[in-house]
Amino acid sequence: MSIDKRGRELWRRIAPARRAAFFGCLTTGLLVHLYAFTNLIPNSDGLSRVYDLQQMTVSGRWFLHYASALNNFTQMPMAAGLLSLLFLGLAAALITSLLDIHSALLGGLSGAVLAAFPCLGYTFLYLFTAPAYCLSILLAALAVWLAKRGWAGGLLGAAALALSMGIYQAYASVAISLALLAVLKETLAPQASLRETWGLGLRLVFTLAAGAALYYAVLLVFLKVKNLELLSYLGMDAASSGYPLKELPRLVLDACKQAASFFFRPGAANAFTTPFLVLVDLLALAVGALCWFLRLRAGALWRELWRPLGGLAMAALLPLGMGFSQILSPYAQPTPLMKYAYVSAYLAVVLLLQRGDEVSARERVLLAPAAAVWAAALLLFCLNTNNLLYTASAQAHRATESYLTRLFARVEGCPGYEPGMEVAFVGAIAQEQLRAQIPSYAQVDHYSAPRDNVAVLNKHIYHYLRDWLNIPVEELDEETMKSIAQTAWFKAMPLYPAPGSVALAEGRVVVKLQEEYTPKSDFEIAYEDRR
C-alpha cells in the first residue's frame, strides 16, 4: 500500500467529530489569537524571559524545563502559538472522544470554545510557557481518556497527569472537571449500567489520586537531587509543612463561590465577566438543563433513579472540580490563567446538546435556535475579550517603550555620561506618569495583564532596556541600590522627570524615580537563583 493510501486510510479512521474538533480548535485559535501570535506582548514576567531555561522546580513545576525545550526556550510568537494550538487541538479531539461527541458540528464547537476561552488569552501573555502549558492541558485530557479505557489505562493516565502537574499544577483541575463530565455522560447513556458507571468513577478517582501522588513523589526527588526548597509561589512551600485540613470546608465553599462569581457576577475578582456574558451563561444553563431533562424523559431514563441523581451530583461537583486550584493552593487566589478548567462548564453544555440531539425531531427544532444563539454569542464574547486583553497589553508596551526610550535619552544626555557606565534606576515608574484612560480596559484588568505599563518593578526597567531595547545596561546589586537610596545627595534629588532627577554621582548615573528604593523580596531573590 502506498503512503498516500495509508494516509487516506488513517484519515478515514478518525471520526469526523474528532477531525472537526482539532481543526475547529486550530482555525478558531489562529483567528482569535492572531494578534498575539504576530506581535510580542508578554506581561511583566515575560520581560526577562525572551530566552529562559524555565528551571522551575522551586515552584513545583519540575517538568516545565523539558516541555519548554519544544520552543527552544525562546519567546517566538508564531512558533509558540502554533505549538500551543496543535496541543490544544489534540486535547479537543480527545475530549470529544471522551464525551462521545459524534456530531461534527458539536465537535467543531468544542474545539472552538477550547481555543477561544479568554483564560487562554491570559496564558498567551505568558508566551514563554504557553506551548508547555497547552501540552499540560493535553496531558490532563489524555489522563482521563486513558483512564476510561480500563485499569491499565488508568495507570498510564496517572503518569500523564503527573507530567501535566509537573508542567503546571493548576491543570489538575482540567482533569478533574473532565472526569466529572465523563461520569455525567454515562448517566445519560442508555447502554451504561450503574455498575459500569461506578467502576468508571472509581477508576477515574484512582487515576487522579495516583497521578497527584506520583507528581509529588517525583517533585521530592527533584528537590533532593538539586538540593532545593520550594519557594512561596502560590503557597507551595507550605505544602511541606502539611495541608490545612481545618480550612478545607471553607476552601471548598470558596472554590464554589469563585465558580459562581466567574460566570454570573460582573466585575468579580480574577475574572472578566460582563452583563453580556451573564446573559450568555444563563442561556447556557437553560439550554443545558432542557437537554438534560429531555434526554432523561426520551428514553425513560429517569425511571432508573441513579441516573438523574448521578447527573445532579456531577453537576453539583463541577464547580468544585473547575475551582480545584483553590484547594490545591489554599494560600493563594487563583488567577485567570489558573481558571482555564472553567471552560468545562461550556463543554458540559456541548455534551448535553449531543445527548439532546437524540430526542424527538420536534424537540430538536426548539433546541437548535437557542443553541445556535448561545454558541454565536459566546464566541463573540471570547473574540472581543481576548483581543481587548491584547490591545490593552500592546498599549502598555508602547507606553513603556516610549517612556524608557525618553528616560535613557536623559541618561545619555547627562553631563559626564560615557557608554558602559553604571546606571542606577532607583524606584519604579510612577503610576501617575503612565495610566491608560480607556474605560473598557477595566474588564481585563489583572496583575498578569499589563494595562498602564509593563515595567511595574525596578528590575523590569533593566530587563526592558537590556532585552527589549538592546541597551547593554546591567542591573546593580541590592546592596548598591540600598546604599545609594540612603545617601543625602540622593534624598535631595527631585523626582524624574524634573531637572536634576538624572545626575552623575560616585562614578555612575543615578535616576531618581521614587523617594525610596523598595528592596527585593526574599522570593524574588531566591527566584532569580532558581535552577
Regions of interest found by a model, annotated:
Residues 153-170, 174-175, 180:
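Membrane-interface alpha helices of multi-pass inner-membrane proteins
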Residues 36-43, 116-125, 187, 217-225, ...:
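Juxtamembrane "helix-exit" motif on the non-cytosolic side of transmembrane helices
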Residues 140-154, 186-192:
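Membrane-interface transmembrane helices that cradle and orient dolichyl/undecaprenyl
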Residues 21-26, 195-218, 313:
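Hydrophobic alpha-helical membrane-interfacial segments at the cytosolic entry of transmembrane helices
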Residues 2-58, 62-90, 97-111, 197-201, ...:
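Intrinsically disordered, polar/acidic, low-complexity terminal segments
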Residues 174-209:
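Perimembrane helix-loop-helix junctions
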Residues 57, 61, 84-86, 105-148, ...:
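Membrane-interface micro-motifs in multi-pass membrane enzymes
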Residues 196-197, 285-316:
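Membrane-interface helix-loop-helix junctions at transmembrane boundaries of multi-pass membrane enzymes
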